[in-house]
Amino acid sequence: MAVVTMRQLLESGVHFGHQTRRWNPKMKRFIFTERNGIYIIDLQQSLTDIDRAFSFVKDTVAHGGSILFVGTKKQAQEAVAEQASRVGMPYVNQRWLGGMLTNFQTVSKRLSRLKELEEIDFDDVAASGRTKKELLMMRREKDKLERTLGGIREMAKVPSAVWIVDTKKEHLAVAEARKLNIPVVAILDTNCDPDEVDYPIPGNDDAIRAVGLLTRVIADAVAEGTVARHGGSAPGEAGTAEEPLAEWERELLQGDTDEQSSAANTEEPTPAEAEALEAPADTPAEPLAAEADGETVAEAPAEVETAAEAPAEAEAEVEAESATPAEAEVEAESATPAEAEAETPAESTDEQA
């Protein structure tokens, strides 16, 4: 599957070239036709060249290389900075300093100076040990270095390849790259020289949407190459590659997946545990000790109620036993204490006889 479709190229205006009077005859093979005094670029060849450049960039990054994004014209500054930052690659979107590649040793010294200035706290005058004027001059130096070298702050060596927007404007970058035999991948408009570029992509280098689309394609190739270099799988759909993850992010995501799987295994009871829960327990287990204590406490009020009901039942039984015929009650009530004492000795005498 192509990394970009013909419809996307047409919507972005990649097929528009320069005026017919501003052209390079070497670009004739990439021109489809002329309309209203403007050349129309053959997008079929552009698609083929995009796939070729995409594969080259992906393989270069997969083998540990780096890509330098270069685009100092206003139409390309934002797209170059955004896409290069997304994939963690160096970029130059302001002024190209002469010798940035051929004299990289000197440039690396300026990068070290920039990092030193970034560590200074310009707001704390007393702690810095410098005067306000010195701090002001150093702040201006820092701002200037950030503007020109901020995009290549982390570039420790010469890049493996260079992505360039508008080779005519960036002729210094093209010359330095060719001198160092660094492959050049670039957008070629109808006024450019294709012999200076190793992997040309015929297209419009003046439209913001066209530059943004092609730069995003190269950034996607860098992203896929980074994923392949770290042993990951490439994204399913070409042209929509996601930003490569760092190693600590991969470990964090892997740890979250393991925790979720272990939690799922803990929540689901095993068949043996399910049978144990369904079967009645003959003897109380240790985990049920708390429940047993709760049941004992709950039964205590019931025992108190039973004890309170016992006297009432005893009184009822006494009343039932005392329920004798009316005559017996009358005799019992009419008997005096004297008669009761007289009857007692008589009964004892008869027993002795």
From Swiss-Prot:
CDD domains noted in UniProt: RPS2
Biased-composition ranges, Acidic residues, are: 340-353
A single Gene Ontology CC term: cytosolic small ribosomal subunit
Q: Does the keyword Lyase apply?
A: no
Q: Where is the composition biased (Low complexity)?
A: 263-311, 321-339
Gene Ontology biological process terms from the UniProt entry = translation
Pfam families associated with the record: Ribosomal_S2
- Segments of this protein annotated with the region Disordered: 256-353
Q: Which UniProt keywords apply?
A: Ribonucleoprotein, Ribosomal protein
Q: Tell me a Gene Ontology molecular-function term this record carries.
A: structural constituent of ribosome
The similarity annotation says:
Belongs to the universal ribosomal protein uS2 family.
Q: What protein name is recorded for this chain? A: Small ribosomal subunit protein uS2
**Which species is this record about?**
Beutenbergia cavernae (strain ATCC BAA-8 / DSM 12333 / CCUG 43141 / JCM 11478 / NBRC 16432 / NCIMB 13614 / HKI 0122)
